[in-house]
């Protein structure tokens, strides 16, 4: 991009996934499509809550091209671990055993991918002593959508913001800043709640909804609901908004305003 060699690169203020314009042969007819790419690292979440961290690694990666109205059809997973055969008593204080992280993370990733129906065509796990200090969990996805299914316009006063997805809970509160905190031997006892509980079935419903051009063409601007919750996902939609947090559907009663505003779930 810096060298001006990406003539097909799509520039938009919807900064969700890298997008390029391509020509696709659809049963002999040439059509203009968008091809979207996204990768996501979930090193910290997977280390403290392996199942949820790995499952939301792929789920979170899907969200970005999906918010670009694309159908995500392919994935890749690259992970890094210390020797999973290491003796339990050699586990670093405040860490989960390498075997526990590796096996549980694999189950978490597979669980989400199977439920949403996403093919992961490349998987590689790298073993190195350096990953004992910090796990590596990288997910990558690709998606595509016909160009004429996507409408991009600036929001105007009077436009409505519609949230689509699961209900809000305390899981996912603090996830945006969690990986930047100072960690110690006790962190694992309290930080796992920062990892959002994934909902593959709900996300699959959104994928199916977005396969209808009569739906996608209604959308002026779309954003994925990531770390930082409402305050980020909706805050990035326009320069000035009125947000009524009481309107948010919740998993249970008792959430305060801050939790409603920043929960990733």
Regions found by a protein language model. Name each.
Residues 1-265:
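Glycine/proline-enriched, intrinsically flexible loops and inter-domain linkers
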């Amino acid at each position: 991009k810096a060298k001006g060699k990406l003539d097909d690169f799509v520039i938009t203020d919807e900064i969700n996934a890298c997008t390029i314009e391509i020509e696709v042969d659809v049963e002999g007819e040439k059509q203009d499509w968008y091809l979207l790419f996204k990768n996501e690292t979930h090193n910290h979440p997977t280390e403290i809550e392996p199942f949820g961290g790995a499952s939301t690694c792929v789920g979170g990666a899907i969200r970005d091209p999906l918010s670009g109205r694309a159908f995500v059809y392919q994935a890749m997973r690259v992970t890094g671990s210390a020797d999973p055969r290491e003796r339990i008593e050699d586990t670093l204080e405040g860490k989960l055993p390498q075997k526990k992280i590796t096996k549980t993370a694999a189950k978490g990733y597979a669980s989400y991918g199977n439920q949403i129906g996403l093919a992961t065509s490349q998987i590689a796990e790298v073993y190195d002593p350096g990953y004992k200090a910090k796990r590596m969990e990288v997910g990558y996805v690709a998606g595509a959508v016909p160009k004429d299914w996507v409408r991009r316009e600036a929001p105007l006063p009077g436009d409505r913001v519609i949230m689509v997805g699961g209900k809000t809970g305390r899981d996912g509160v603090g996830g945006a800043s969690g990986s930047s905190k100072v960690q110690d031997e006790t962190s694992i006892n309290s930080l796992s709640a920062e990892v959002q509980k994934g909902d593959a079935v709900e996300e699959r419903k959104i994928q199916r909804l977005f396969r209808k051009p009569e739906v996608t063409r209604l959308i002026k601007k779309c954003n994925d609901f990531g770390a930082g919750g409402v305050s980020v996902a909706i805050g990035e939609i326009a320069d000035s908004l009125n947000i009524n947090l009481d309107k948010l559907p919740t998993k249970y009663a008792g959430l305060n305003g801050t939790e409603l505003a920043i929960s990733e779930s």
